[in-house]
Amino acid sequence: MKNFETLFAELSEKAATRPAGSRTVAELDSGIHGIGKKVVEEAAEVWMAAEYESDEAAAEEISQLLYHLQVLMLAKGLSLEDVYKHL
């Protein structure tokens, strides 16, 4: 099972090595604006799942939002520590 740190390490590796066909690479290439639009979309899906769907569906949507937030962090050059210091 992945956690926040292992996901970030995996995404960082993909950003560095840029494997062909990687969804992460494609999203990074879409830029901050494209990634931001995806974050907003996923946040709305989290809300709708939490409001109207099962706990399992809400958890899945939350995991997708966390993925896109981490891609945004990578695009901005932010580390986990940059974010953790604000928690």
From Swiss-Prot:
InterPro entries: HisE (IPR008179), PRib-ATP_PPHydrolase-like (IPR021130). One of its GO terms (cellular component) is cytoplasm. GO terms for biological process: L-histidine biosynthetic process. Pathway: Amino-acid biosynthesis; L-histidine biosynthesis; L-histidine from 5-phospho-alpha-D-ribose 1-diphosphate: step 2/9. The keyword NADP does not apply. It comes from Paenarthrobacter aurescens (strain TC1). It is found in: Cytoplasm. The gene is hisE. Signal peptide: none annotated. This is Phosphoribosyl-ATP pyrophosphatase.
